[in-house]
């Protein structure tokens, strides 16, 4: 049974970690202790309160945090988990962050011998709840293949796109297209109502 640490129990992360709790040994971490306590009551799993003191080896560490600063804090800061990981652990990040931070995290992962997959998600809260997210993965093919079954716990469509900055750019491009489309549709509706 794979040992998984899931970091970030927000709107997306909470149900994603819930899917993983079926058939895996899941431990969760969240800055807000209340959310983590609620997750433990709802699903089968364990809780940790300090990432910098990890001493139990995990097969996978999965993060879904809010922004660049959050990702840096949980990985490479003095409070982060990277310094305690070994080369067998695959770190999968689902956060929507900048290419700059992904490049920095990947550089540190290589230096420390950590397998890192940059894997943004799309599909919204409903996709997370229903286990039907689309996942665009950047990183090493063998790490992706090793992680495929874990990703399928909450992802309906999982594809590797190659380099780290490629997938981040794809996610940002897709988000921008959606915004432009929505704005255009809204403007068209208002023009129609005016006429």
What is the meaning of each model-derived region?
Residues 15, 60, 66, 70-73, ...:
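Amphipathic alpha-helical hairpins
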Residues 166-195:
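Helical "substrate-binding/catalytic lid" subdomain
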Residues 1-63, 89, 125:
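NAD(P)+-binding Rossmann beta1-loop-alpha1 motif at the extreme N-terminus of oxidoreductases
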Residues 51-115:
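Rossmann-fold NAD(P) dinucleotide-binding segment
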Residues 97-176:
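Rossmann-fold dinucleotide-binding core
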